[in-house]
Structures are given as structure tokens and as C-alpha cells.
């Protein structure tokens, strides 16, 4: 169990032995006795007879590889987590009806054991509908085609399959004795997902379905409570929970249930063609502090590590292959600083008052028009206060218990003894890490040479079906591939061609199309994350007589949620040609021939054992700007042990594999220059995904994570399928590495030692504020690029001196830090000497390189 007890004083520990209040609405654990019971009352989850304040972290096992799991879980624990939470991904585990898969990235038991071995609890969100920006919301596509099946309503075929899979997962966990009632570590389970927001759209079948789902879950006899997020009418004893950027005002639907937050979004997902969302750590911390101050007892970050949508697992549609989410642990498994460390310090500060928060009495004190205190006191004399300033513009000085406190706008100060500020959400003490992607050209990796395979434009092999008019793309492919060829022929009277500007008009439900006329590419068109359907006009050169039109329809992930989402289709809906003496040729009702997938897919050219397939044609130099081309090249392992990304900026759009492992869809689609980006990010005020965006005018995703465990010591095969055309000679592997570290700390920042603080200390617990810098293991601070002690301004890599600057700044910092792996610099007078700017609040800003 993650470390809460280390923060308790002896007196507080003794109080845990006192009789507990009667438990209301509790679910009683079954088999393993009181020591493993998980129940709840109105205040919190109760584990082994003790109320618990819990920090939970979402890590989705299929979005990383098993070799990464131990480090990810360890980073969550080091960040202050008590729990790891994950969805269960039905379509990954049952890709065909009755055929189960629990290997490699989908080895749920292995992942759960790693969590258990780390001493953490687990929250299992079975769903089995999960949304999660995962293709088809995690539900298998084959289920949509099971006779009579309608998803997520009072439909017997759907409920039968849902119950069968839920039972399969529960039985698997029981077999491993993972539920807390068996002495294991799973303390909560979830059924369904955010259905309350959909009920109105589903009509009369909605409520009976929701009540059935709850009843079905309870009948599984797990011995632990069940939750339903965003399910406002969740029946007792199922706990309804909150998902949002802020949940401090949330109230459960019964006074007997505790206040749980299953999804606090520390960032947001990204779609191809848009800029990058960023949620400032100050605002994430603000939301968490407000939640616990207002009586919350379990909070989960969705997601703490987002990872990667490998292969064709992205949803949306148009969700990027990266599921980085601006999470505290980035896509590559590295700490995102300062976010990770700022939240770690927040968790420590809250945990200092855990007993008082859970067993004490609460009161509310107004400190001003938009300033307030939530105060908790217990019988032992414990006192914890959350001082809040919800004004989004103005800093305030407030008086609480005869003391003055500085409260920045949109911030919360945590006082674990109602006197000393242990943490303020707006004052970030942690260093910032600046990451670089360091390239290693494929040519420098002893490349054996390139081979290619060119796709035919249109029908290859036998025709799969012929129809007058259009078929739906997804209904035809059953999501076995992204690709479906639509091909037709038509005759043109030569007398109608003279002087005309001929235009091809295409309408599509989504998601993308490439058009070929008479075996030549004439254009491409795409929808986007906010609108999958599109129409496009392309100039064409017709010829007298017979013309052949081949349209390649493409999907970019399937719909992952929304009312009746399984009926969202894709594919061509209208094709016309204009420009012939005011005559329009409507091809929509023509005879169309269809071919599912690509020839290279049929021959599995992406598989590791297909490297010597005779269809591969060796090339001394790979062709450039060639559409519909497969590329194969042998590569060495990038040096070092840094995480690796595949730089695809030189390519168009397609799919990539290493040694048969599906890296995923790549598409360095450029976001608009005007896509909501701002020169600076103000954390203050309510956050939305449209705020604090970055990367306008840049590729949405340039680098694609390639786990190091996918590389062999030698003889690695990289396979690329390129749809549009690009320059494969400029593809590189890049190592993700720390380039520089920055810090910006003022003298009034909280400086209590959170590891050793005790509320019974006789002094105020304060030392001078400090800047702490550290480079990764094996690196040291090689140069100090900027330093100013005074009133500097700016952000990392753009700091500027202010009107107050101490001349000893550089010498003090270089003496402490240069050639060191890490260093600490105090903002005390002893360090910098004479105060040259009396009355000015001193700040120390540093930027240093690591090498």
C-alpha cells in the first residue's frame, strides 16, 4: 500500500484504533475476513476497517508494452499514488467471438501482478464499453453484426454478450485472487462508462439497461464496491462518480455514498490536423486541492500515463497515434516536469492531514468575496485548512486565524496544521525539463538497402463485390483494414470534351479518400476530428471513350462513443463529374466494383517473416513522392537507452511497423497557424481544451513511439506503407532525451520539508526557499545558460532579467551546480550576500544544459 502512514504522528496513528462510526450503505467483502474487507461510508472507502484518502493514476496496459509497465507503476508510486486504475479493452481481448487474447500488451494478469507487487491498490474499470478514445469504444466490431444487437440499451443480445465478457474478466481476477475480498489488491470495479450523459438519447430502453448493468455487476460477487461514473441514478449500493476537469462541487446521489472523482483530465487528447492541448500544472493542482478540500476522498488522474495507440487502436475518428494527453508521465514513459513533481508535492501535502480530513469535522469560513477556507478539526487537536482564492484575476492577502496569507489568483494553499503553508497550487517549486528529439539517420545505421512494393491503383486480385451504387465502408470491411477500393468505368463522348474544365465532385461520410483517374493520382481529401464527412472538387483530364475511376476510401479510427455510435458509417456517398457543356455525369448509381484492403496487406508484407518475400523489389535508392508504395529497410538499434521515436515529417500518411510490431498510423498533418495558440499560457480561470494550445502551424504528430523492446540486437526490419508520397530517405529514429533544466522559484514559495514535517513541531517549519536542479542519471550540468536572482520574468528558454539583478547570480549558481548531476541553491541572504533591492520579492531563475 502506497505511503500514507509515514506522514502520521504517533498520536494520530493511535487514533486509528478508535471505534469507527457505523458504516452506511456499505458493500461487505466476502471471503477473506475483516483484514481484507473493502466497504464505504459517506466519507470514504474503508479498507481493512480504516478510512482511506486515495490518489489513483490511470495507466492503460495496451497503450504501452510489458517491458515498460514496472517503471510506469514505480513512477506512479513515487508520485504519491495509492492506486493504479485501468480500463479493460474488450475488443483487444476478444477480437473474434469466443476467441480470447491475453498476451503481450493485452496481458491483463501480468499488468495487475506488477501493480500488486509494487504495493499499490488497483481499480478495474471493466465497462466493457470504455470510450477512452479507443477504436469503437473498446467494443468488438463483430458484435455490431451479431443478429438483433443494439449497443448500450435494453437489448437482450447486447446484454448477454456484455454479461458474458464481464463475468469472464471477473472470473479471471478471482482465479488470481486479485480482489481485496480474497486478500488481493483490487478495491473497486466499474461497470458501464459515462452512460448517464447518454440516457436521454437512448429513450425508454436507457434506464432499464442502466439498472440491469448495476444489478449484473453486483451479482458477480466480487466482494468490493462497484462504481458507475457519470451515472446520476446509480442504484444503491453502486457509487456514482464524477468525470470532469473540476469535481469539487459534485455530490453523490445518496448521503450514504462517498465523493469519488474517477476522471480528472490533466490534459486532453489530440486529433490529426489540430494543435496540441496543454493543461497547466497549476490548474490541475488547483482542481485536486479544491476537490479534497470540499470533502472528496478518492481522485483518479485520467490519464497519469497516456501512452501510444499502437496499430489501428485509435478512436475518434482522427485521434492521433500518440495518446500523450499532456499527462504527468509522457508517452515515452518519462516524467513530465514540472507537472509530475508539482502533483507529487500536492499529494504529500494532502496526505499530511489524511486522518483529520477523514475523521474530523468540517467547517466553512468566508475570507472575502471569492476567498474561502475549508477547515477540518479532529478530537486530537488536528487542524487542516484549504485556503482558496477562486478569483481568476486578482491575487489576495487574506486573514485566517489571526495570520495573513498571500493567495495568488486561482489557487489553493494547504495548511496541514492550520498555520503553516505546506503547498500552494500556483507556486511551482519543481524544475522544468526540456526534452529534445536527437536524430540518428537511417543511413548511418549500416542499412542493407531499400526494397519496395507498389500497390495497384484500384482492384487487385478478385473483385470482392459488385453493386449499383455505394456500400458503407465499415459495413463492408468490418474494420479488418483501413482501406476499401471503389472502382467504376464510364464513357465520355469526345465531342463533349472540347474547351471544358472538368471537375470531379466527391462526397464522403468519412474519413478520407484518394482519387485515381485512368491510373493516375488526381487528389486526396480528408475530414477532421470535428467533422468526419467532407466534400471535395478535383480538376480532372478526361479522355474520349472509356475512363476508369478508382477511389480509395480510408478510415482513421472508428467512432468511440456517443449515442448509437456503432451506426456511424464511412465511405463514399456521391460522385459526379461536371464541366461538359453544362452536362453533369452522375456516377452515384453506376456499377461499382469493390476490393477490401491492400494487396500488401493480403500478402502480410509487414510481418517479420516476410522480409524476403519475392514481391519486394530491391532499390539502390527508394523512390520519392510515390503514392501507394510499401518500403522496407533494415536498420540497427539506436544507440543508448533513451526512448525512441520514428521521425516521419518527410512522409505523407500511412502505416509503420518494426519487426512486425505495428507502430501505428502516421500522418504529420499540419495544424492551422490560427488554431487557438497563444504566445503565453495563463493558468488562471476555468480550463477547457481550447485554452493554452501549442504547436500551431506545425505537424500534429511528427514522432511515433517505437518501444526499445521491439528492437533486436541486429537485423531489424522497418516497413512503411505510404499512401500519398514522401521522401523515405529522410526518415530517422530519434532519441528522446533531456536537453536542459529550468527553475523559477520566489522567496515566498512554501519551503516546508514535506518528508519530515510534523504538526507538533515547535517552530513554523520554514526554511529559505530553494531551487533544486537535477539531470538524468549519467548526465551533469554542463553549462548555465541563464541565471538571475532578483525579479526576472519569462518562461524556460525565454527568461529575461528584470530591474533587480544580483551580480553574484552566475557565480553562486555555477559554484553549486556546474559539472554536478544535481544541485540545490538557497534563496537565503547567506547565499547571495547584500540585498541590493530592498522591498522587492526575490526570485531565482535558472536555465542549465544537461550533457
UniProtKB/Swiss-Prot annotation:
> Which GO annotations describe the biological process of this protein?
galactose catabolic process; plant-type cell wall modification
Q: What InterPro entries does the entry give?
A: BetaGal_gal-bd, Galactose-bd-like_sf, GHD, Gly_Hdrlase_35_cat, Glycoside_Hdrlase_35, Glycoside_hydrolase_SF, Lectin_gal-bd_dom, Lectin_gal-bd_sf
Q: Enzyme class, one word?
A: hydrolase
Which GO cellular component terms are attached? apoplast; plant-type cell wall; vacuole
UniProt-annotated location(s): Secreted, Extracellular space, Apoplast
CDD domains the record matches: Gal_Rha_Lectin_BGal
Where does the record place the catalytic residues?
Answer: 194, 263
Instruction: State which Enzyme Commission number(s) the record gives.
Output: 3.2.1.23
UniProt KW keywords: Apoplast, Glycoprotein, Glycosidase, Hydrolase, Secreted, Signal
Q: Which reaction does it catalyse?
A: Hydrolysis of terminal non-reducing beta-D-galactose residues in beta-D-galactosides
Q: Which residues form the SUEL-type lectin domain?
A: 765-851
Where does the signal sequence lie?
Answer: 1-29
Amino-acid biosynthesis keyword on record: no
Q: Name one Pfam family in it.
A: Glyco_hydro_35
Q: Which residues are glycosylated?
A: 35, 361, 475, 528, 533
MF terms in GO: beta-galactosidase activity; carbohydrate binding
| Family as reported in the entry's similarity comment | Belongs to the glycosyl hydrolase 35 family.
Q: What is this protein called?
A: Beta-galactosidase 3
Source species taxonomy: Eukaryota, Viridiplantae, Streptophyta, Embryophyta, Tracheophyta
